[in-house]
Amino acid sequence: MFTCGWVGERYCPGTLNAGRGLRGTLSNVFKILFYTPEIPGNTGNAIRLAAITGAELHLVKPLGFNFDDAHLRRAGLDYHDLAVVTVHETLDDAWQALTPERVFAFTTTASTSYADIEYRPGDVFMFGPESVGLPAEVQQDSHVTERVKIPMKPGRRSLNLANSASIAIFEAWRQNGFEGGAI
């Protein structure tokens, strides 16, 4: 596991970056977990989302890009140093670091709507790779509290990964009174 941050012009492992964003303690912030993300722009957008909401972003390898990717940087704009981004070698490593109480696996095959959940600080929101979503074995992981979906029109495949994470995090944050935010 390593935590990332910008050092000069290069994104690289560093110490835990509490940033200047809306941060709580490690146990009371929402956590976004991207399992093997493939598209750098989506992760860049999620970095920006984490900075804006005070959430943490956790990435599980293998990643479909490197942190020098221009698309990742461009999507994150100047928010990279305001976010906590941690890269984990494996999903087991992520669980060990996160010690999650509740994990919500977002998948189009779930029957429960994300809007039917009462979210609590510390919850983990897990999303799969853009091309295939969360594999069945990851959805069935013992850490997963519930599988949830974002409703869509019939016949549509899925939402964009970063958009899905935004919907989830903002709903959880809204339910918790936008704690720490400026309204």
Annotate the PLM regions.
Residues 1-183:
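Post-transcriptional modification and biogenesis factors for structured RNAs
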